[in-house]
């Protein structure tokens, strides 16, 4: 079995570190979510910061076939990154409470900013430690 080649410094730590050491270069991000063109913000220091990764894009394009969110209740987006899944769920179902959770402070900042830019009031952004123990969850992505 071959050993995995290490990533360059700082590349994979965004998955596990609240405050990664990689430079946080933020930039505008134009993206289409839930049929709306949105002007958001992203960073080089989060997963798939330059746009939708292929798997997320496929999921969002096929929600009606694989994972339609509930129309109300609470959906948790675990590992929200810059927010594409949380924002899509919130846009599709304004009556849904969306709780976006990420270990990365940068990802949480981006998701909160992007929810604000999209005019969404039904997105709550939390660190894993902030999630209430008694949170009733109807769906998790």
Q: Where are the model-predicted features located?
A:
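Generic detector of intrinsically disordered, low-complexity, polar/charged segments
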Residues: 1, 7, 32, 70, ...
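N-terminal auxiliary segments of SAM/dcSAM-dependent transferases
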Residues: 2-36, 44-49
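Glycine-centered flexibility sites
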Residues: 35, 45, 55, 79-83
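Generic secondary-structure boundary/loop-capping signal
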Residues: 43-44, 49, 82, 128
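Conserved SAM-binding loop and adjacent beta-strand
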Residues: 44-64
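Conserved SAM/SAH cofactor-binding pocket of Class I
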Residues: 58-133, 137-141
